[in-house]
Design a protein with these regions (language model features):
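Active-site SXXK
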Residues: 82-83, 229, 299, 359, ...
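N-terminal type II signal-anchor transmembrane helix
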Residues: 1-51, 89, 108-109
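A penicillin-recognizing enzyme superfamily signal
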Residues: 78, 289, 293-296, 302, ...
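Short, well-structured active-site flanking segments
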Residues: 91-101, 174-177, 236-241, 476-496, ...
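Non-catalytic, structured segments within soluble enzyme domains
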Residues: 22, 27, 111-367, 532, ...
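Conserved catalytic neighborhood of penicillin-recognizing serine enzymes
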Residues: 110-135, 186-189, 256-257, 435, ...
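Beta-lactamase-like hydrolase cores
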Residues: 18, 27-44, 192, 306-319, ...
Length: 850
């Protein structure tokens, strides 16, 4: 009896000692334990998604793919698959399975090192949220205590829901919702039993048990899960047999992007990181942009087609690489496709290798193993490139352009395949709503994979004659009118600084003598612009440009400003053109309309400052001082003293700080009124004439009238010295668009081409705004304005219409007249008494006006 008594005492002491040890261990570990109460308000990492204005997914940013689901949204069969495999006694224990803990402790004691045993789902949840994945006894003890705490805080269903959304399942997929999409491309409710079991088998080793890494291992692991489900009574023998016989059909499925616009979505990403830091990638933000799918894709297609058209007419630069030469042993198909898979694709351009070639046809192998045929129709364009101004002869047979072993580029045109090449030239397009600044479309280059440099917002390029409408606006605000006569004759003036004559020339070098300002802009006469610049003063003109939002540091204070020597981005140019079309208001471009959190709550909604031509909003600069010399006079030798010029310079009242591209939230406000509404109408009317001209002369943008077949549009070409940059900017109802094209290498110019007859409707001659940039503008605007009713230009209050003589700009006194618009009080008062003859002077080769 004494022995039994002592044995009981010893047992009680051991129990007390064990309990005390556990309590002591708990008190020692307790300060190191995190607060499990945070699980009540846990925010799972969810990627940021970027949408178009019409709700189409454009991009997704974030390291972790996750689709949060409630437990009710997860099929019970999938829940049971995880319970059977990971924790069959889940509903019976209180966070810790004593059998599993005993096994882990025994292994640690007898092996001499820590090794993780069977953890419950609650323990796994504790580890995933609060602990590192290291396999140590200390971490295991913490895991146990945390699991017990979690079971006290949360219900079993809450634990399961968190676990099934948190668990890592391979290929950046976190949670069963993301795994279903990544491996099978469908939501969880559409998964088969076999597919659910495949996913449930992943937590043990997601990198090696996933079906994309090893189908054999994935199948074996799936079968283990099915066996556990059968033994636990979750499925029948028939269901088990059927699921076990299924072949796992898994492929990697990227997020379902409806359409891609990487230059714009990269701008969104940067803005979100600026606002929210790294949390932008984790908190499930939904960002809605201002673009729609139809309009944005029209812009991207217009830019790509125009760049490829330019590139083709300048000739073929040859293969990108030669893998084997004619006569050498050819590579086998696997070696070719392995090589091609290392190369990117650029829009419609795919890398390929020529495997066969004869005079009539070539066969090229694509990266996916497909062979395509290249016939003469798809190769005839490929004249050899000699330089930017010279092309070789048109190929007469296929082998004149391609040979076996060459790595080339191809693209599909209809049902046929054409030889292609990655363009050297690049382009950008920006389109905005002139009333509120919403970006309607933005393209920063030919292809984001080729170059991530966003030319729409980052490229400062000389604007050439695209600047003339702004300068003529300044001149008219100083006293000129659309009927003012300026002398279109050559200029030669000594430049003391340069030590030579400065002789600006028209392009083409034709001169018409005295002409009206409207014609000077419509035909883009350089010397006429220079005379207007001299009349109003360089400093006045340079300062006036800031009204249109152009940064002062990019504006030169020399007469070359008249020819477009200032450098702006396409976005800045589009913003400036909006002022001329919206009644004179400087709107702020923005591209984010709304930001929501992961629950759909609105965090930000744009409230842009709008233009309101009908509102009585004064011009913030006040009235510009008029010059009495800027009346209807011959401007050949007009000059104003420096003192007069400086006294008339309007001081900018707009801050020149960084102009944010995201409109600020707040009450409705109006954009600054920077030029008066009647004046903006005059320049808008003049831009219309740049397209449609007048009897006897054609505007430089005439192709837009032909292509769009509507008269409520206006625009201006722009070409810089040596054609290094080409522009076309203009408006239509509710839209302003600017297009730029040129080389990133400033040493290269756009050159010229000769007609070959091999390309349908090929443009030839000197490149420039009308030939190189305008085709993209025309194609885009035609798509955007399709179905939009024509809206004739309607003069605002303060505009009067007067019949004038075309040659003198005075009141008409005969048949050679037209109606002209004037700001009330500036119309001519004298009748024309004679007609001034027009002298045409031709100083060289004729090529495209700019």
């Amino acid at each position: 009896m004494k022995f039994v008594k002592y044995l009981l005492i010893l047992a009680v002491c051991c129990i007390l000692l064990g309990a005390g040890s556990i309590y002591g261990l708990y008190k020692y570990i307790e300060p190191q334990l995190p607060d499990v109460a945070t699980l009540r308000d846990v925010r799972l990492q969810i990627p940021m998604q970027v949408y178009s204005a019409d709700g189409e997914l454009m991009a997704q940013y974030g390291e972790k793919r996750r689709i949060p689901l409630t437990l009710k949204q997860i099929p019970p069969v999938m829940v049971n698959a995880f319970i059977a495999t990971e924790d069959s006694r889940f509903y019976e224990h209180h966070g810790v399975d004593p059998v599993g803990i005993f096994r882990a402790a025994s292994i640690a004691l007898f092996s001499g090192h820590a090794s993780q045993g069977a953890s419950t789902i609650t323990q796994q949840l504790a580890r995933n949220f609060f602990l590192s994945p290291e396999k140590t006894l200390t971490r295991k003890i913490k895991e146990v205590f945390l699991a017990i705490r979690i079971e006290q805080l949360l219900s079993k269903d809450e634990i399961l829901e968190l676990y099934l959304n948190k668990i890592y399942l391979g290929y950046r997929a976190y949670g069963v919702g993301a795994a279903a999409q990544v491996y099978f491309g469908k939501p969880v409710e559409q998964l088969t039993l076999s597919e659910m079991a495949t996913i449930a088998g992943l937590p043990k080793a997601p990198s090696t048990f996933n079906p994309l890494y090893s189908m054999d291992r994935a199948t074996a692991r799936r079968n283990v899960v099915l066996s556990r489900m059968l033994s636990e009574g979750y499925i029948s023998q028939t269901e088990y047999d059927q699921a076990r016989s299924d072949v796992i059909d898994a492929n990697y499925h990227a997020p379902e992007i409806a359409f891609s616009s990487p230059y714009l979505t990269e701008m969104v990403r940067q803005e979100m990181v600026n606002r929210y830091g790294e949390k932008a990638y984790e908190d499930g933000y939904r960002v809605y942009t201002t673009v729609t799918r139809k309009v944005q894709q029209a812009a991207q297609q217009a830019v790509r087609n125009n760049v490829m058209d330019y590139d083709m007419r300048h000739g073929y630069r040859g293969p990108s690489n030669v893998l084997w030469k004619v006569g050498e042993s050819a590579w086998d198909s696997k070696k070719i496709t392995d090589s091609l898979k290392t190369l990117p694709t650029y829009g419609p351009l795919l890398p390929a290798v020529v495997t066969q070639a004869d005079p009539q046809e070539a066969v090229a192998l694509l990266a996916d193993g497909t062979s395509v045929s290249l016939r003469m129709d798809g190769i005839r364009w490929a004249r050899p490139y000699r330089s930017d101004t010279l092309q070789g002869p048109t190929p007469r047979k296929v082998t004149d352009a391609v040979q076996t072993g060459q790595q080339i580029w191809v693209r599909q045109v209809g049902d046929a395949w054409w030889l292609a090449q990655v363009p050297d030239v690049n382009s950008a397009l920006v389109s905005i709503n002139p009333q509120n600044g919403a970006v309607m479309a933005l393209v920063g280059g030919f292809d984001f994979n080729q170059s991530k440099f966003n030319r729409a917002t980052q490229a400062l390029r000389q604007v050439g004659s695209n600047i003339k409408p702004f300068l003529y606006t300044a001149a008219m605000d100083k006293g000129l009118t659309l009927a003012s006569i300026l002398n279109d004759v050559p200029i030669s003036r000594w430049d003391a600084g340069a030590g030579s004559d400065w002789q600006p020339k028209n392009s083409p070098p034709q001169y018409a003598g005295p002409i009206r300002l409207r014609q000077g802009l419509g035909q883009s006469k350089n010397v006429v612009m220079v005379r207007a610049m001299r009349a109003m003063g360089v400093d006045y003109a340079a300062e006036y440009l800031q009204r249109f939002g152009f940064p002062a540091q990019n504006i030169v204070h020399t007469e070359s400003l008249a020819l477009g020597s200032a450098s702006f981005t396409p976005l800045q140019v589009a913003r400036g053109y909006a002022v001329m079309t919206n009644g004179g208001f400087l709107i702020d471009p923005y591209f984010i309309s709304k930001i929501e959190n992961d629950q759909g709550g609105v965090l930000f909604e744009a409230k842009p400052k709008i233009a309101c031509a009908e509102c009585d909003i004064p011009v913030i600069y006040g009235d510009t001082q008029k010059s009495n010399v800027l009346e209807n006079k011959d401007m050949e030798d007009v000059a104003i003293s420096q003192e007069q010029q400086n006294s008339a310079v309007p001081q900018p009242q707009l801050e020149q700080a960084n102009q944010a591209l995201v409109a600020q939230t707040g009450a409705q406000e109006y954009a600054p009124h920077v030029i008066n509404t009647p004046l903006s109408f005059l320049i808008k009317s003049a831009l219309n004439t740049n397209i449609f001209g007048e009897p006897g002369w054609q505007g430089t943008g005439w192709r837009a009238g032909r292509d769009l077949q509507r008269r409520d549009i206006g625009g201006k070409t722009g070409t810089t010295n040596s054609s290094k940059d080409a522009w076309f900017s203009g408006y239509g109802p509710g839209v302003v668009t600017s297009v730029w094209i040129g080389f990133d290498d400033h040493r290269r110019d756009l050159g010229r081409t000769t007609a070959s007859g091999a390309i349908k409707d090929q443009i030839s001659g000197y490149e420039g705004g009308a030939k190189s940039a305008q085709p993209a503008w025309d194609a885009y605007m035609k798509s955007v304005l399709e179905g939009v009713p024509e809206q004739p230009l309607t003069p605002p209050p303060g505009i009067v219409t007067v019949n004038i003589d075309r040659n003198t700009g005075q009141l008409a006194n005969g048949g050679n007249s037209r109606e002209e618009y004037f700001i009330e009080g500036t119309q001519p008062t004298r009748q024309a008494v004679h007609e001034v003859g027009t002298e045409i002077i031709d100083n060289g080769e004729t090529h495209e006006l700019f």
